[in-house]
A protein has these predicted regions:
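Positively charged, polar, low-complexity stretches
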Residues: 2-105
Length: 105
């Protein structure tokens, strides 16, 4: 899902929070598997805003992987820089001690 539903101010704010985060999920050689999607979904439920490290490849390949992850997890792709992807999915029932939006926002 593209970041079209976020305003420029929202994107800037989320990038600022995301800058200090470490990747929660790193995708290995097997690529995007159902298990990886499940783990990303779990991380989004807990943290709302996460970084994912994707495999090396061409820019088009990395963009395709980033968009596939966002679509499969119903998340919004905030930004994709190099091998890092920043995703957000709001969870009204998120634990404030785990949510990166509540802790850093």
């Amino acid at each position: 899902m593209a970041n079209s539903s976020l305003s420029n101010a929202d994107i800037k704010h989320l990038k600022g929070i995301g800058h200090q985060l470490n990747p929660v999920v790193m995708i290995g050689g097997q690529g995007v598997t159902p298990t990886v999607i499940e783990e990303i979904g779990r991380a989004l439920n807990d943290h709302e805003l996460i970084k994912v490290k994707i495999p090396a490849g061409s820019k088009a390949d990395r963009d395709a992987v980033a968009n596939a992850i966002a679509e499969a997890t119903d998340a919004i792709l905030v930004t994709s820089i190099g091998r890092m992807v920043l995703l957000v999915r709001h969870n009204p029932e998120a634990n404030p001690k785990l949510s990166n939006l509540a802790r850093f926002g």
